[in-house]
Structures are given as structure tokens and as C-alpha cells.
């Protein structure tokens, strides 16, 4: 992975990804450099549009808001039921008051 990170670092810095540049980054990071891996990486990245590859690899965040919307409706229904119970209790109290009033 260090080799890929080195190439991404060079790309984000606007530098050309060459064998010498990758070796320099890896050496600066204290990584023991394998020439064959560096050559393979540079050869594999030749002609690749890294920006396009990053955009394609980036996965959009799944819409998790849809399940959250359903619980928001439930408290509204509970409030309506509570109001109905309060109205029924108030009506019953008023009716009893009329009996004794």
C-alpha cells in the first residue's frame, strides 16, 4: 500500500509519477524500497487518469435518511391520540359537572 500512497502523494502534489520520485517518497518515509515493485507500479499507472480513477472509486454515501423519516411520523400520531384522550376526559368531567351543578 505504501507504493500506492506514494503515487497518490506525488499526484496530489502535481508531480510526475516516476520511478525516482516514488523511490524518493518511500525512502523519505523510511520504507525499504523494492525496485521491482516500483517499476511495476509506474508501468501500471502509465496512461491512467488518476483523477478519474479516484472519482470512480469513490462510493456515494447510502441514503440512510429514509428510515429516519418513519419514526418522525409516529410521535405525531401519539400526540393526536393523547389530545383525543384529554378531550374525552375533559368532556367527561364537564358532563359530571352538569349532573351535580
Swiss-Prot record:
GO BP term (any one): translational elongation
GO molecular function: structural constituent of ribosome
Compositionally biased intervals (Basic and acidic residues): 73-87
InterPro entries: P1/P2_N_sf, Ribosomal_P1/P2, Ribosomal_P1_arc
Keywords linked to the UniProt accession: Ribonucleoprotein, Ribosomal protein
Gene name, Swiss-Prot/TrEMBL: rpl12
Subunit and interaction comment: Part of the 50S ribosomal subunit. Homodimer, it forms part of the ribosomal stalk which helps the ribosome interact with GTP-bound translation factors. Forms a heptameric uL10/P0(P1)2(P1)2(P1)2 complex, where uL10/P0 forms an elongated spine to which the P1 dimers bind in a sequential fashion.
One Gene Ontology term, aspect cellular component: ribosome
Region (Disordered): 65-89
Family membership: Belongs to the eukaryotic ribosomal protein P1/P2 family.
Function (record text): Forms part of the ribosomal stalk, playing a central role in the interaction of the ribosome with GTP-bound translation factors.
Signal peptide segment: none
Protein's name according to its UniProt entry: Large ribosomal subunit protein P1
HAMAP family noted in UniProt: Ribosomal_L12_arch (MF_01478)
Amino acid at each position: 500500500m505504501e507504493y500506492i500512497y506514494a503515487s497518490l502523494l506525488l499526484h496530489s502534489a502535481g508531480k510526475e509519477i516516476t520511478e525516482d520520485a516514488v523511490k524518493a517518497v518511500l525512502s523519505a518515509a523510511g520504507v525499504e524500497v523494492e525496485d521491482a515493485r516500483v517499476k511495476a507500479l509506474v508501468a501500471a499507472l502509465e496512461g491512467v487518469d488518476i483523477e478519474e480513477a479516484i472519482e470512480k472509486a469513490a462510493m456515494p454515501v447510502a441514503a440512510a435518511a429514509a428510515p429516519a423519516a418513519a419514526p418522525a411520523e409516529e410521535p405525531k400520531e401519539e400526540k393526536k391520540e393523547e389530545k383525543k384522550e384529554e378531550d374525552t376526559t375533559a368532556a367527561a368531567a364537564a358532563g359530571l359537572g352538569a349532573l351535580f351543578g
